[in-house]
């Protein structure tokens, strides 16, 4: 049975990824700082992991075992809405830790297992991380951390290409989650189902790409 490691799986998109993959018979390793009743009800393997704890993230590969078919680095934070003072700047730094550095460290930590399975490494990004698409400004911490994630994942895809691993970043759309709000047009089920179709279709030619949940390629 194929296996998937999902971060930030206690709610929102991460929970929906865990629900859908579990329903399809995958062996799911779900991580979160704290679990939730909804996640516990799925009956999947739940591991505590705080993405702010970089030592724990970097050593997580030993908890995966041999062979990893899919990593979905989903956990993230919005960070401060503006950066106008030293306190905001500290929040910006923490946003980079969670949204950029920790996902990359985790991908590196599980790379040996992914190589064994010729697996896929997926970073959940956002269209707000596209420099070309930024026509409205604002949200400095979130935008910049996701733009950096995109750049890191692009390099990761190049670095792992010879080992048979496929790596890409995905934009889930504007989704009804705690981050997206209730006015968002997409439900988590729709977004995740779309992203799963994109993931299924990824091959070496698409590695290093940036795609929306509907398969549309997004400019960097």
PLM segments and residue spans:
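Rossmann-fold scaffold of SDR-type NAD(P)-dependent oxidoreductases
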Residues: 7, 68-76, 99, 123, ...
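Catalytic loop of short-chain dehydrogenase/reductase
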Residues: 77, 84-96, 101-105, 117-161
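N-terminal Rossmann NAD(P)H-binding glycine-rich loop of SDR-like oxidoreductase domains
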Residues: 10-20
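Conserved glycine-rich Rossmann-like NAD(P)H-binding loop of the short-chain dehydrogenase/reductase
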Residues: 21-39
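Conserved mid-core alpha-helix of short-chain dehydrogenase/reductase
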Residues: 56-59, 102-109
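C-terminal helical subdomain
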Residues: 169-172, 181-220
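Conserved Rossmann-fold cofactor-binding substructure of NAD(P)-dependent oxidoreductases
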Residues: 52-67
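Rossmann-fold cofactor-recognition segment
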Residues: 42-55
């Amino acid at each position: 049975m194929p296996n998937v490691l999902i971060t930030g799986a206690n709610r929102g998109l991460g929970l929906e990824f865990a629900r859908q993959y579990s329903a399809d018979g995958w062996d799911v390793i779900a991580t979160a700082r704290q679990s939730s009743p909804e996640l516990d009800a799925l009956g999947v393997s739940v591991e505590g992991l705080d993405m702010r704890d970089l030592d724990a993230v970097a050593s997580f590969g030993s908890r995966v075992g041999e062979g990893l078919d899919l990593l979905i680095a989903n956990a993230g934070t919005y960070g401060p809405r503006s950066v106008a003072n030293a306190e905001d700047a500290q929040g910006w730094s923490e946003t980079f830790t969670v949204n950029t550095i920790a996902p990359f460290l985790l991908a590196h930590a599980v790379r040996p297992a992914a190589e064994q399975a010729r697996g896929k490494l997926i970073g959940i990004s956002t269209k707000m991380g596209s420099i070309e698409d930024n026509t409205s400004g604002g949200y400095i911490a979130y935008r910049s951390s996701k733009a950096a994630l995109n750049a890191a994942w692009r390099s990761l895809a190049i670095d792992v290409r010879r080992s048979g691993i496929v790596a890409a970043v995905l934009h889930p759309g504007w989704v009804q989650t705690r981050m997206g709000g209730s006015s968002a047009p997409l439900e988590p089920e729709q977004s995740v189902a779309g992203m799963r179709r994109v993931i299924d279709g990824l091959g070496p030619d698409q590695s290093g790409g940036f795609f929306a949940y509907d398969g549309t390629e997004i400019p960097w």
